[in-house]
């Protein structure tokens, strides 16, 4: 079978050897969010502006990165566009400014911050991913979606604790950048939709075998 592993960041991920997955050339791996800190999956999926900023800021290029919000434009427009934000927002830049000939802009209203991210038009590992289900779906759902869109017919999900242990949203990276410290008390804002999205993704890709491993 054409097998893909979707690597989530729930605590149960510790039960699985990522190194074993990496050595199996018959498997394609799709990681979620900041998995890159630990393991270079074949593909890295992200849909949160702050996480995308972290990935690009660190000039991470070991995985093919799929961002649901990624619309780079030529730097010919950079000065006029960024200037329009400076009066009301703090502007923070990320990525390789010297090498990049394209840029993307992300606003983060809670802190009145605009992130300007630099990338290349040729040879970049970053690309836009358009989900089939919902823009509001979790990163894990987007990663499953991406694997299905690429034709994988057998999908195994690890570190998906909110599915295998309902109501458990603990995260391996809690307490680090972009992750809350009080993980045991945290419920994601869209958590009530996640179960629905998992059902929708299975229905949409009816011929794909999707399995969640504890």
Regions picked out by a protein language model, each given a short descriptive name:
Residues 1-214:
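Metal-ion/cofactor- or nucleotide/acyl-coenzyme-handling active-site neighborhoods
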